[in-house]
Regions:
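Conserved glycine(s) in the ABC-transporter nucleotide-binding domain "signature"
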Residues: 1-103
């Protein structure tokens, strides 16, 4: 096996580990988006997300809004990074001409 193949297999294994870590973190983060409703000059915040075919709205206390917003932003970043890692894995598979054996 050549040095280049060894390096590509190591990178593939690293990418697999990174994807698993990102997927675990994604499972702990909230899905959806924050919506604001103004009723009688008061603002109410809701976390909107899908639960099967239904759209659910859960009330958020004003203190929770920024924390949840940061978690949702982190989720978007992780989804983009996960897609990039999956693209990288496909490129490595094409370069090697096979799927590397990862333990």
């Amino acid at each position: 096996m050549s040095i280049l193949e060894d390096v590509l297999e190591e990178e593939y294994a690293r990418s697999i580990r990174l994807c698993r870590h990102m997927e675990r973190e994604l499972n702990s983060l909230p899905k959806g988006s924050i919506r604001t409703r103004k009723i009688n000059s008061h603002k109410y915040y809701y976390l909107n997300y899908r639960d099967g075919d239904k759209v659910r709205s859960d009330y958020l206390h004003a203190d929770e809004v920024e924390v949840i917003r940061a978690k949702i932003n982190r989720r978007h970043e992780l989804v983009a990074a996960l897609k990039e890692q999956q693209r990288s894995q496909k490129q490595i598979e094409k370069a090697l001409g096979r799927v590397p054996n990862v333990e």
